[in-house]
Amino acid sequence: MKFLLIACLAVPAILAQQTSAPGGNLCTYPPQGDESNQKAVPIQDFRTSGLDFVRPNWCITHCADRKSVKAAVRFQFANQSTAVPTYKVRRTFTRYSGMKVHAELISGNPTKRDDDPFNFCMDDAVSAQIDTIVNTYNDIETMSEALNFYINKPGWAYIIYDMGVPPSIIETDNVKHDMNYCEKSSNKQMPDGTYMTYQVFAGLIKAN
């Protein structure tokens, strides 16, 4: 999955593009056409876990400072019906407005979760476990490993972002309402009353 890297050397709140990943990782597998692509910039840090070795179906590009990342992932969706909605989702995180979400329906019949229309994690147990992990642990490395350990779904891989100090943007395409797919944000309240925001992108990865 060969693609352009975003904003390696600066932290503007735009999805600027560059052609290399200096000191980081540049994924060069050719695209297959059914990927879910997620771009996040600028962020504080990210970690992965689960079946997360870089390969054609789990392709992660990032800069050396890990402040920007692009994931191109081929998920094994549980429901192959064309009626299942597909969205393009843009999350904008600002200091004054918090997280704003715009979800554009690309195809299928629109559906949403009753509790949160912008939570694209259809498995209630997975969604709840993510919130528990974010609120239990204090470092992103431990959070990433806890996602794999506690959710415990064979074949799944996880990427979690510490969004850090706003502003930042996350864009995701080919977002599905599917039990084998999860894309959501989670907030953690700190002792001083402020909040930290984390973003999780996860699911069952295609075997080939």
From Swiss-Prot:
It holds the Pfam family DUF5352. Residues 1-16 form the signal peptide. Keywords: Glycoprotein, Signal. Glycans are attached at residue 79. This is Uncharacterized protein ZK1320.3. It comes from Caenorhabditis elegans.
